[in-house]
């Protein structure tokens, strides 16, 4: 078993990177990949950079060069579900773009031409994540995570997302691109992120203040998940 782990920002990968044993670093095309072992699992940890293009590029490099069996996307997200607060966990059952629109040609909102309307996370990985959440006694919500190249910080964009994707539980900037590439490669994936803000007018202030909290929570869960995967 080899696990690929993806975070966009330094703060989202540093806690995991520091615990990788026999760590080696590969830098390519603006991405950094750290390989070694963590909690008994061979890992390749990617720091992709922010946004959909960086995430897609990095995920492609990760899958081509390291050939992981599964991909775990970690980091922070803006909460949309009413029950979520800072530090809570969101687990994807599927991911969609919130900023793709080819509805003029009969596609669903958020669906890219020639692609599925949503990219489905792997059910076995979801089950494993939920077992780890229960063991850690974390508050989590499972559902749709939406992605786009915008930090949601205001009433109008937030209302648009809520109206277009009323079932969405969280919003961020990379997960759907990661899911898209994993779909193309046939690699199972899951998104496991922690809430840093609630995507409102104060989200930029909340994000800066609580990113470390979100990174700690999501990294804790990823470590637990790796230990679970190591047991088979």
UniProtKB/Swiss-Prot annotation:
KW Hydrolase (keyword) present: yes
Entries under InterPro entries matching the protein: MTA_SAH_Nsdase, Nucleoside_phosphorylase_d, Nucleoside_phosphorylase_sf
EC number: 3.2.2.9
A Pfam family assignment: PNP_UDP_1
Residues the record marks as active site: 12, 197
Binding, substrate: 78, 152, 173-174
Catalysis performed (reactions): S-adenosyl-L-homocysteine + H2O = S-(5-deoxy-D-ribos-5-yl)-L-homocysteine + adenine; S-methyl-5'-thioadenosine + H2O = 5-(methylsulfanyl)-D-ribose + adenine; 5'-deoxyadenosine + H2O = 5-deoxy-D-ribose + adenine
Any coiled-coil regions, as ranges: none
Subunit structure: Homodimer.
Family: Belongs to the PNP/UDP phosphorylase family. MtnN subfamily.
Stored NCBIfam families: MTA_SAH-Nsdase (TIGR01704), PRK05584.1 (NF004079)
Function, as annotated: Catalyzes the irreversible cleavage of the glycosidic bond in both 5'-methylthioadenosine (MTA) and S-adenosylhomocysteine (SAH/AdoHcy) to adenine and the corresponding thioribose, 5'-methylthioribose and S-ribosylhomocysteine, respectively. Also cleaves 5'-deoxyadenosine, a toxic by-product of radical S-adenosylmethionine (SAM) enzymes, into 5-deoxyribose and adenine. Thus, is required for in vivo function of the radical SAM enzymes biotin synthase and lipoic acid synthase, that are inhibited by 5'-deoxyadenosine accumulation.
Protein name (record): 5'-methylthioadenosine/S-adenosylhomocysteine nucleosidase
Protein's gene: mtnN
